[in-house]
Amino acid sequence: MNALGIQLQLRGTEHVPRSGGAVLACSHVSYLDFIFAGWAAQPSGRLVRFMAKQEVFNHRLSGPAMRSLHHIPVDRGRGLESYATALDYLRAGEIVGIFPEATISRSFELKTFKSGAVRMAAAVGVPLIPVVVWGTQRMYTKDHPRDFSRGQTLALTVGEPMTIQTGNPLGETARVKATMARLRDETIRAYPEMPQGAWWLPVSYGGSAPTLEEAARLDVQERRDRLGVLTARAQRRADRRWRLWPPFRKAT
């Protein structure tokens, strides 16, 4: 932080409880969000255990750090196991961080929310704390080069704890999203820079980021490309095993 000369704007950190379990629901615009969203709990002397996709834990650089901090890996094929682990953390009085949008928003608008955050809060009976992170997309996000130049401003806004009612996950998820949309707008308006046409600003604020619809198409293409890479990799492994299969070696 100091080495990069980051100007950090913190608002509402007093809303993070000093004890007991809580779900921290965070907006998602950057690969760095889990790092800076954790600062929301620091004034209360708390740590946040973030749920993050398995690929982050498999990475040679981020993996050791994620495991040492006891964050929670989310394997798409074993989602229930990750969910159960998160509930155990909450019951033990920990704060669990989750990104309801699941993936980075290329439009820098709020995407469709998954219901996991409200389901966890309702299941254990803990408050949900809405958090908005802004400015991290200028440093490291999808489709743009990294920029760690000095003096950038990062903003973090924490909303009041929300009591989540059971039996209506879709309605409660919509309520959380509406609350976070309001916090996001407040955060952007208080941000010291809003240059017209900036790539890191959403269209609704005069920026040139993709619209939600354009971003959705880019997300679909990204998934297709990733599937193509995984399929090709699996085919290469299969071809390699076939070439090494003993009967095939003798025949050649």
Locate each region found by the language model:
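Structural motif corresponding to alpha-helix initiation and N-cap regions
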Residues: 10, 59, 80-83
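Short, flexible loop segments at the rims of nucleotide/cofactor-binding pockets, characterized by
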Residues: 1-5, 73-77, 106-107
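Alpha-helical membrane-targeting segments
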Residues: 1-7, 58-69, 147-151, 250-251
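A short, well-structured juxtamembrane/interface segment
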Residues: 1-20
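Non-catalytic C-terminal accessory region of glycerolipid acyltransferases
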Residues: 80-252
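Short acidic-hydrophobic, aromatic-tinged amphipathic segments that line or gate anion-handling sites
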Residues: 10-11, 72-75, 164
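Catalytic core of membrane glycerolipid acyltransferases/transacylases, capturing the structured
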Residues: 17-78
